[in-house]
Regions:
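C-terminal motif of bacterial Sec signal peptides marking the signal peptidase cleavage site
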Residues: 17-20
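Extracytosolic ligand-binding ectodomains
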Residues: 2-4, 12, 22-431, 438, ...
Length: 451
């Protein structure tokens, strides 16, 4: 009887278990996923860049554009936020062919594209007429290479430059000629706003210092044969030939001076202070001089790092103005950040208040938009290289800074030399010690063998 009851009990239990297995559990409430934070809006900031990308100055135009592209790449990598939005910078590059008419055409194109700012143009001759179009549209413009003083003398509140102008450069070059013992000078310019402007400023400075101008000749920015004007200059027996123009003409001119047996030294401004000048002039450039606004890149705190990044990125050496164009972009972005706006009407005023620790200088502008206290550096061509001579002009602070940086560089070089010598001395000491140990071991071995 008990066995029967047990069987029944087991059957009931099994049935209950099966019944339980067939029941579904009520699902437990699951917390709703947290809402993802709303993505911040992105605003595209269009910066125009204009330079000759074709023709004899294309190498300089590409150099300028690369300086701007490197700056924009770094700004985008930082992920800047302005006015509550993430900013993405884009470069709109245009080719003005170093032609004033074409410069105005592409300037209007950028105005129509509603760019937030313009970096350029490269040449003074294209920058000056284009600047009126940008001014009328209220678009800020910063040039990293246009040095003719007229650019910032037009009264436009939108025009700025990040390097010394030709008044400053011409004065320094005139003073330098006197320091070199020059008594007579022949002047040649290419009739462009830059070339003629620089030559005129040099002439004023030279005459004020008592130099005699024995010839004043002209060419153009497309010429390659200068023998006619150089033959005239040869007859004057000038101590110095000053050229206001670019490297595409300066290099061949120096070469033809040598071919004609002209013994005078050649002196020019930033337009001929380039690797291209040496390439075109060859051995004829040896011993000649040129100037560049600013302090040598290798003597600037951030200079060597910038050069390494530039070469790695573009696979090319810096030609001339790339560091200044890089600074021009950075100054524009800095003004936008301070204004907390990318609207030209709102950030323009902040450009005038700039005090930016740039690559090429401590960038600040005077009431005209010119760089305050811009220095000028003199170079000499030696053995196919540009060799730094000295930094002149500019504010005492700028020159003093250059001298301090030069002294620091010399100390570093001396320290490397001392470290190298110490390393060599250490190597010799270690070698001598090793030889002594080896000799002692051999002597001990010989003594043991004798025993």
């Amino acid at each position: 009887m008990q066995a029967k009851i047990s069987v029944v009990a087991l059957s009931v239990a099994a049935a209950f278990a099966l019944s339980a297995c067939g029941q579904k559990e009520e699902p437990k409430p699951v917390a709703a996923p947290a809402a993802a934070p709303a993505a911040k809006p992105e605003v595209v900031v269009k910066l125009g860049h204009v330079a000759p990308m074709t023709g004899p100055q294309a190498h300089l135009g590409k150099d300028n554009e690369n300086g701007a592209r490197l700056a924009i790449e770094e700004l985008n990598a930082k992920g800047l936020e302005i006015g509550g939005a993430k900013v993405k910078f884009e470069l709109l590059g245009e080719d003005d062919q170093a032609d004033p008419k074409q410069g105005s055409i592409v300037a209007q194109k950028l105005v129509d594209a509603k760019v937030n700012g313009v970096v350029g143009h490269l040449n003074s001759g294209t920058t000056i007429p284009a600047s009126k179009l940008y001014s009328d549209a209220g678009i800020p413009q910063i040039s990293g290479s246009a040095t003719n003083p007229k650019y910032t003398q037009q009264g436009f509140k939108t025009a700025f430059r990040v390097m010394a102008n030709d008044v400053q450069q011409g004065k320094v070059l005139g003073d330098f000629a006197v320091q070199q013992g020059v008594k007579t000078v022949a002047i040649v310019d290419d009739r462009t706003a830059y070339g003629q402007g620089l030559a005129d400023e040099f002439k004023k400075s030279a005459q004020a210092a008592g130099l005699k101008v024995v010839a004043n000749e002209y060419t153009n920015d497309k010429a390659t044969d200068f023998k006619a004007i150089l033959t005239k200059i040869k007859s004057t027996k000038a101590d110095l030939v000053f050229y206001g123009g670019m490297d595409a003409q300066g290099g061949p001119m120096a070469k033809q001076m040598k071919e004609l047996g002209i013994k005078a030294k050649f002196l020019g401004g930033d337009g001929v202070c380039t690797p291209e000048f040496m390439k075109l002039g060859g051995e004829a450039t040896e011993g000649h001089y040129c100037s560049l606004p600013g302090v040598p890149l290798e003597k600037l705190a951030k200079g060597p790092e910038f050069k390494d990044k530039f070469v790695k990125k573009f696979g090319a050496e810096i030609q001339l103005y790339a560091p200044y164009v890089y600074d021009a972009v950075m100054v524009m972005a800095d003004a936008m950040k301070r204004a907390d706006s990318v609207d030209p009407a709102k950030y323009l005023a902040e450009i005038g208040k700039t005090n930016y620790d740039g690559l090429t200088a401590q960038v600040a502008f005077d009431e005209f938009g010119d760089l305050k206290g811009g220095a000028i550096s003199i170079y000499q061509y030696k053995s196919g290289k540009l060799e730094y001579v000295s930094t002149l002009g500019g504010s005492p602070v700028a020159v003093a800074k250059a001298e301090v940086q030069e002294a620091v560089a010399e100390v570093k070089d001396a320290a490397k030399a001392v470290a190298g010598a110490a390393t060599e001395a250490g190597k010799e000491a270690v070698k001598a010690g090793a030889d002594a140990v080896k000799n002692a071991a051999e002597a001990t071995k010989a003594a043991v063998e004798k025993k």
